[in-house]
Amino acid sequence: MYPIVKKRVLNETVTLMEVQAPLVARKAMPGQFIIFRIDEEGERVPLTIAGYDREKGTVTIIFQKVGYTTEKLDSLNEGDSLLDFVGPLGEPTKTEGIHRCAVIGGGLGVAIAYPQAKALHDAGAEVDLIVGFRNEHLIILKDELEAACTNLIIMTDDGSNGNKGFVTQALQKQIEDGRDYDTVIAIGPLPMMKAVSEMTRPLKIKTIVSMNPIMIDGTGMCGGCRLTVGGETKFACVDGPDFDGHLVDFDEAMARGRMFRAEEARAKEKHFCNLTGEAR
């Protein structure tokens, strides 16, 4: 069992948890992920490692309440335990050779962008961290983000905090203002990562995207997380999650991501009814 030692609500839909998992913490690196299971009847869910403390033996995860399992996870508190917490899985983010970069996080992707930006910043790279939220009430980890970069740019859809607009607009302005990036890292919704990759393609800026497709076993056996990258089949769990954004078939990835929306909605509705006793 893996005890939850800290729970922190970041906004109305996003929660941070620290989980006691010393073996995972000992080996974890930025960009890797874990797969957890709440109990014997639970599904296996992948979450990117948002942080780790090797001395305390803890791993930090950040999740958004979007379906049955994340709703159930959010109902747990400090002192409760998870049945399974497997990892670290996937390839860590490669920081070698990166000197001036833009790390872009959209929505919950900010939680994944944070450890990658911090690793690059700690390694001596000049990091512009561009993060986007719908409004100021959804902003998370602001203090941590400021400490993890050279320059923090906050974008909100409604202009309630930082600059009004989208992360792609902020990246475009940075490039137009003469920022000479050797690498761009984009993490977040597939349409955003696709837009960033299309923007940097003609400029020949190396672009890395973090892919989080449907995943079950995390070892490459089930094939659920397969992607087409450069015309070849890759598996996000073992070959990724980081890939060359100029080679990823985003349209295929988006189509696969929509495959089980109806089933996910029904599971969430059933969970709500079980919790409240209400019929919908």
Can you describe what each PLM-predicted range is?
Residues E71-I216:
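FNR/FR-type flavoprotein reductase catalytic core
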Residues F235-D239, F243-R280:
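Short Fe-S-cluster ligation motifs
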Residues G42-G51, L89-E96, C237:
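Short, Lys/Arg- and Gly-enriched loop/turn segments at beta-strand edges
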Residues M1-D80:
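Ferredoxin-reductase
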Residues D39, G87-P88, G230:
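Short, surface-exposed secondary-structure boundary micro-motifs
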Residues F36, D84-F85, L227:
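A generic structural signal for residues embedded in beta-strands
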Residues K6, G51, I154-T156, V209, ...:
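Structural signal for conserved beta-strand scaffold positions within catalytic alpha/beta enzyme cores
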Residues I112, L190, N212-D242, H271-E278:
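Local cysteine-cluster metal-coordination motifs and their immediate loop/turn environment
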